[in-house]
Amino acid sequence: MVTIRLARGGAKKAPFYHIVVTDSRSPRDSGYIEQLGYFNPVARGQEVRLHMNQERIEHWVSKGAQTSERVGKLLADFRKQNQA
């Protein structure tokens, strides 16, 4: 099954996550099919905290991809943010 989930990057105690499409059986940070955005939980000042390619996410969901619980919450936040 194809999943949209977070892949961790960044340094120790400074996490940075890529939002990726990957096979659900593959390890968290291994290769992925497509990168759809990023999430920076420790963004400061003018840094962008969350960026997603919403069009591509909708494309993958229409093809049957499942979003992880956290990505689903981030997607809802992103939609609220862009709606306002």
Swiss-Prot record:
It comes from the Bacteria. InterPro entries: Ribosomal_bS16, Ribosomal_bS16_CS, Ribosomal_bS16_dom_sf. GO terms for biological process: translation. Keywords: Ribonucleoprotein, Ribosomal protein. It holds the Pfam family Ribosomal_S16. GO terms for cellular component: cytoplasm; small ribosomal subunit. One of its GO terms (molecular function) is structural constituent of ribosome. Belongs to the bacterial ribosomal protein bS16 family. NCBIfam families: S16 (TIGR00002). This is Small ribosomal subunit protein bS16.
